[in-house]
């Protein structure tokens, strides 16, 4: 819903609540109030969902809810908060993404190539020009238009008292304005024609590579669970269960790691686990080749594509299937080690219209067969039409 010329408006609006004050309390006063309670309020934003996350000990629940209510319903929209948060987002794009984080730049380059003329094609933090074009009144208007009753999902977990959920509905949700709750229609993702490459030339010490293509599968589809097994075998994030990791790092020592994904993936802090609450109606299959020395970049790209070709053409053996399914049945239990993560997956399941995702993994995977997995691979994965994003020095020579 962001205007084309104001990319970053959603992120900036979210930060005015997650890193801002209320109409009656400055951000500094709010922080001083929360710190003695060991409480926190933060904002997480993606293309289709923004989440305001609050955590507090139950002894301080009553005053905490009042602060949370005021942040959501009547944000302060303070000029100093606006300037600080816009500068934070601008620095994240200019200094971090473009300046020092070649891995993320490679992923965003893949998005730009894969999702041209599409809302997913721009970084969630916005663009330098888009952020510069945003005024405080634009943030106020965006908040009024989209933070409405029909757009809200409330999730509560932990040791809360009886009637607390109803209280949140009454004291927070009911105070929001009415509004259009229908999601924006998404354009069809452009069809790839062969292997399309986008090179970014910068003074990088190594070459970062991301590969991907759109898939018509989300957690709402039965085939998602079969693809979970296939993906765990092929490229489970930051584990040696994945074939890519074993062959490219383990056997050849090309780089730190090589992984694959069947949906948009953001790592949760320093863990190996995915962030919750970033559901999308359109998903992609992707391969992340972490930076490799320039002289090995061509080889790493060719090997990753070759391994994908083998996966598509040959699938998994019975032994590979059994081992990967068993690994995933156990590993997925680690997804919900905290109350916050359990709540996050419950909310994601509500968005996708499914039963609780973690329970579904335990229910569905035991009944899968190797034929189910290989059939799903043939239906949804391929190696001929690929978007390939490369961040490297002397890009012209890479051609």
Where are these regions (language model features)?
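Non-catalytic, conformational "gating/processing" segments within enzyme and secreted inhibitor domains
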Residues: 91, 95, 107-108, 136-171, ...
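An aromatic/glycine/proline-enriched structural segment found at the starts
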Residues: 116, 153-217, 236, 392-399
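A short, acidic, amphipathic alpha-helical segment used as a generic capping/interface helix at domain edges
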Residues: 368-375
């Amino acid at each position: 819903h962001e205007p084309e010329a104001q990319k970053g408006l959603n992120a900036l609006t979210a930060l005015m609540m997650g890193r801002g004050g209320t109409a009656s309390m400055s951000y500094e006063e709010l922080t001083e109030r929360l710190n003695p309670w060991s409480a926190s309020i933060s904002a997480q934003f993606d293309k289709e969902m923004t989440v305001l996350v609050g955590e507090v000990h139950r002894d301080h629940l009553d005053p905490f809810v009042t602060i949370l209510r005021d942040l959501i319903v009547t944000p302060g929209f303070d000029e100093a908060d606006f300037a600080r948060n816009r500068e934070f987002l601008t620095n994240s794009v200019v200094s971090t993404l473009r300046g020092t984080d070649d891995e993320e730049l490679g992923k965003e380059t893949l998005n730009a190539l894969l999702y041209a003329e599409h809302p997913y094609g721009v970084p969630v933090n916005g663009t330098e020009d888009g952020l510069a074009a945003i005024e405080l009144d634009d943030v106020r208007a965006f908040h009024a238009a989209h933070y409405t009753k029909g757009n809200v999902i409330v999730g509560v977990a932990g040791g809360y008292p009886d009637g607390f959920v109803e209280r949140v509905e009454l004291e927070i949700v009911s105070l929001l304005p009415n509004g259009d709750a229908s999601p924006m229609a998404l354009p069809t993702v452009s069809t790839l024609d062969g292997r399309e490459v986008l090179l970014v030339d910068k003074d990088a010490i190594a070459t970062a590579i991301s590969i991907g293509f759109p898939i018509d599968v989300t957690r709402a589809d039965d085939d998602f669970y079969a693809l979970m097994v296939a993906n765990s075998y092929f490229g489970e994030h930051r584990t040696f269960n994945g074939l890519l990791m074993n062959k490219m790092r383990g056997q050849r020592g090309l780089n730190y790691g090589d992984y694959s994904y069947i949906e948009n993936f953001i790592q949760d802090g320093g863990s190996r686990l995915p962030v919750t609450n970033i559901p999308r109606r359109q998903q992609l299959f992707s391969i992340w080749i972490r930076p490799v020395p320039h002289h090995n970049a061509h080889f790493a790209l060719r090997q990753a594509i070759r391994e994908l070709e083998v996966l598509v053409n040959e699938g998994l053996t019975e032994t590979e299937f059994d081992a990967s399914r068993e690994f995933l049945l156990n590993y997925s239990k680690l997804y919900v080690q905290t109350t916050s993560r359990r709540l996050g997956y419950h909310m994601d399941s509500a968005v996708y219209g499914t039963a609780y995702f973690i329970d579904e993994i335990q229910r569905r995977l035991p009944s899968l067969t190797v034929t189910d997995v290989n059939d799903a691979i043939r239906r949804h994965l391929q190696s001929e039409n690929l978007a390939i994003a490369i961040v490297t020095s002397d890009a012209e020579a890479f051609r």
